[in-house]
Amino acid sequence: MTRAALGPLLLALALRPAAGQLVAVGPQFVLADYREVASGLRYRGNGFGGTLWARRNRFSVEAAVVRLSFDPVAGSAADSGFTATQVDAWVAYDVAAYASIEVGVLHRSVDPEFDAQSVGAVRVGARSFYQIGPGATVVFRANYLAAPKFSGGGHAAVSLDLGLGLDVRLAGRLHGTATYAFNRMNRRTNPGGTGEIDAPIQETVARLGLALGF
């Protein structure tokens, strides 16, 4: 098969309606804002990533990976940037036609290691989804981030991740996706053993992408 023939064939497969669609995968462009509130550190960044979603009966899995480059904003106490790789994953079970309960993980690694906080946490929460029009679905997610671990130490009794998403079927198997997530970890540290102080961390992540269903 020639390259000239292969291109139209792949396009036709992408645009053909999918019966019983179970898997979707695609690229994402990402914008992010990261703050360590007490120390006056604030960064903005962007990058690229990918997402995978799969469903079988009432169960579904979702994963997203992104690589971000951050730079300090005006007025930040930071004088240099860093890169971060973030992995988000969920396993969900539908309890109703419009709602699921879910568990998962959040993992963010940072380079250079101590320019910002690397974080790992377990997700426990729920999501709801509503069809707002033909081929268009809006999703709201709320997760408690349990047992977070920080590269710089400390603990956080209250950590939340909230998300809003939109999925629009553009043509057949091809979807457009947009998500916005906000998480805040009310971290506390005890530097030098002199007593605990507040050191909260918050991050916002906006993703815009395409997904191809199979």
List the predicted regions and their residue ranges:
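Predominantly the C-terminal beta-signal and adjacent terminal strand-loop region
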Residues: 156-214
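Repeated loop/turn-to-beta-strand initiation elements of outer-membrane beta-barrel proteins
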Residues: 23-24, 57-63, 97-101, 133-138, ...
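Short glycine/proline- and aromatic-enriched beta-strand/turn motifs that initiate or cap beta-hairpins
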Residues: 18-75, 205-214
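Residues that define the transmembrane beta-barrel architecture of outer-membrane proteins
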Residues: 42-48, 55, 81-87, 97, ...
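Outer-membrane beta-barrel translocator domains and adjoining extracellular loop/strand segments
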Residues: 35-43, 71-82, 111-119, 149-160, ...
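Transmembrane beta-strands of outer-membrane beta-barrel pores
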Residues: 29-35, 56-58, 65-71, 105-111, ...
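Residues on the lipid-exposed face of transmembrane beta-strands in outer-membrane beta-barrel proteins
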Residues: 27, 50-56, 89-93, 105, ...
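Cleavable N-terminal export/targeting peptides
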Residues: 1-24
